[in-house]
Amino acid sequence: MELLCVLAAVAALFCGCTVLTLKCRVPASVAPLTALSLIVAVLTLAAMAGVLYPITWAVYALCLAGGVWVLATRKNHAGAAQKLFTPGSVLFWGMALAFTVYFFVRQPMAADFDELSLWATAVKITKVNNDLYATAELGTPWAATQNPGLPLLSYFFQFFGNYADWKIYVGYDILYFSVFAAVVGAIPRSKWRVAVPMAAVLWCVPFFF
C-alpha cells in the first residue's frame, strides 16, 4: 500500500511534466527538475502561510487533472510520445521507478545519519503536523536553522500513507535523477549512445564530493 502511495506521487509528477512539455514547451528532460522546483516553491510558500495541507491537495489535483486533460485533448499522440520520451526523460523515469521499488524493498532507515542534522526528523515532523517543521517544539534551535526545501520535497512524496524513512530517500533521489536528466537532455536524440556513458559519469560524480 505504501508503495502505491509513492507511485501516486510519481504519477502526479509525470502528469505535471506532461503539461510542462506539451503545453509550456519545456524540454522533457528538463521538465522533472522544473516541476520539482515549482512544487517545492509552492509548498514552501504554503507552509509559511500555514496552509500546507490543502495546498498540497491542490497541487496533486492540478498535476493529475492537467496531465489527463493534455493527453485527452491532444490529437497527435504519436508526436506527444516523441516529445515526452527523450533519452534524458527515459533515464529519469526509469531510474525513478526502479529506485522507488528498490527503496520499498530495502526499507533503509535514517537513524544512522540523523544524529545531529535532524534532516529526517524535520521530514517526520512536517508529515505528522502538516506544517512547517521550524515551528515545532523540539527543545533545540537546530531544526529552525534547516532549509525547508528538502523536507517539503520529501513531504510531497510522504503525503499519502504513513511516514516512512525510505520515502525520504525516494524523494531525494528523484531530485538527484532530475539533474541527471537535465544534463543528458543536452544530447541530441541522434547521439543517444553518448547518453549511456554520460549517465554513468553523472552517477559517479557525487562520490567525489
Spell out what each predicted region is.
Residues 1-81:
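Membrane-embedded, hydrophobic transmembrane alpha-helices
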Residues 8, 38-46, 62-65, 94-100, ...:
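Lipid-exposed faces of alpha-helical membrane segments in multi-pass integral membrane proteins
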Residues 47-54, 106-111, 209:
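Membrane-interface helix caps and helix-loop-helix hairpins in membrane proteins
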Residues 52-57, 78-92, 191-195:
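Membrane-interfacial entry segments at the cytosolic side of transmembrane helices
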Residues 72-79, 98-109:
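Short charge-dense sequence patches
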Residues 85-105:
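Internal/C-terminal transmembrane anchor helices
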Residues 101-207:
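Active-site lumenal/periplasmic loops and adjacent helix-entry segments of GT-C-fold
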